[in-house]
């Protein structure tokens, strides 16, 4: 259960915890327990949209196919993939979720072993088995299906839903392109790139890695060889480049996924004041997050 927060950009949801059982005394009776009920807040973190125009003559000359196909193509190749990629990347970045060892999984046997490890972790964390969804790359999931063994069938049966995910939607972080800046005019998203900030160190720290920047290219410099007179030009990596995800297990009740506003409409050419063109508009405003007391409901395995 969630409700509007103190401002329009957030929602709040209840979180409750109780103390456990104590010894019962035949004279004084029950041990007094406590109930802690609090409201937690989370802000909307996704606000994206696009406007496509198709000239009336272009549409006519394609037998009225161009306009309809443009809308369908937007949803199939841009909206749906970005929504998936944003969801997985956001969940992968949540602090406190369970993670396997970073490695490349190349065989069905290795995948089976990693899934058993993930299942053990979630079982020991007392995550309910019902409602667990397995998302994995198509290669891994299909390899496990083709394995067709007792063990592979048993592990797959442990998940309520099994869904293959294209690798292009399966990263630990993504960059949402703004559609305006140089190099981002096409919009959409890309695999998350490393992020850098100017160092705050006033002197080199031995063993620490700094970076110099030239035309957007960052070159590492070991702290032992960094120049104290050049500290103002050094950067530090604050976010590493995204990793490819092997698989993710999501206990559905653990996540908050809410689309507050979705609009998809058409403005005909005769209502367009700027051009003789039909317009398709699409906007989505929502959030993806995890309940603070249910982070164990997310298990992540990614490549090194």
What are these regions (language model features)?
Residues 4-19, 40-45, 62, 106, ...:
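Sequence/fold signature of self-assembling virion shell proteins
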Residues 13, 37-100, 123-138, 265-290:
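Long, contiguous amphipathic alpha-helices that act as assembly "spine/axial" helices in icosahedral shell
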Residues 22-28, 293:
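Short, glycine/acidic-enriched capping/hinge loops at junctions between secondary-structure elements
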Residues 26-28, 126, 170-176:
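Glycine-centered small-residue hotspots that permit tight backbone geometry or close packing
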Residues 28-31, 35-36:
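Active-site-surrounding "flap" and adjacent substrate/cofactor-binding loops of secreted or lumenal enzymes
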Residues 74, 114-121, 283, 296:
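Short, hydrophobic/aromatic alpha-helical segments in well-folded domains
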Residues 96-165:
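Extended, solvent-exposed, turn-rich assembly/linker loops in the middle of proteins
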